[in-house]
Amino acid sequence: MAGTQTRTTPAAGWLSIVVPVLDEAAGVVAALQALAPLRECGHEVIVVDGGSRDGTPALAAPWADRVLSSERGRARQMNTGAELAGGEVLLFLHADTLLPAGAAAAVRAAVATGTAWGRFDVRIAGASAWFPVIAAFMNWRSRLTGIATGDQAIFVQTALFHRLGGYAVQPLMEDVELSRRLRKVSKPACLKERVLTSGRRWETRGVWRTILLMWRLRWAYWRGASPEVLARAYR
């Protein structure tokens, strides 16, 4: 379900970057400014707002090709952006995550080999000495299982994304659920180039508390727990 378009610059190249946001006024401008070189190359940046109350859409508008509104929920927001994307490849980027230099070239090279989808390695911004360890484990686990997380900037051929029905509309683990379906089509391209994602989740809740929580939620999900129940525990 597409929302309201507030900017209509036709800059779609072969890559469409979809950024779901909710109350990201503090960082959205810097995040989108980092994507300016990609826009200059003709790639498309689509911001999808889930009902921000802090002026995020207005701040984003000068730095995006489209700013859309959607019902709240990351999966819904990403599906909304994908519906209006003009690129051959979709890249889903969290608002607190930065792409590495050469990201588009890395994705292009992966897709040129016939890869249908993939993700980047991740590193975590912050002072904790545990962050490199956590990131290394996330990257290793993803290579081992073929499951990607949203922090790793998932990319997928647009036609395949639509053929599979997009993200399942669920409040948590939507990235895991999509990965499960995508890996039935092909193994992911696990790019060694690293995105930089915020460590604020770990810093706010505590590193070990967050690790244990995420392990518990993931284990429960694999055992069939409802995403709605898990989302309440995550909050």
Cite the ranges covered by each PLM segment.
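Hydrophobic helical membrane-anchoring modules
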Residues: M1-P10, R180-R235
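Short, acidic, metal-binding catalytic loop of nucleotide-sugar glycosyltransferases
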Residues: Q33-G42
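Conserved donor nucleotide-binding strand/loop of the catalytic core
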Residues: H43-I46, P57-L84
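A conserved acidic beta->alpha catalytic loop
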Residues: D49-P57, T97
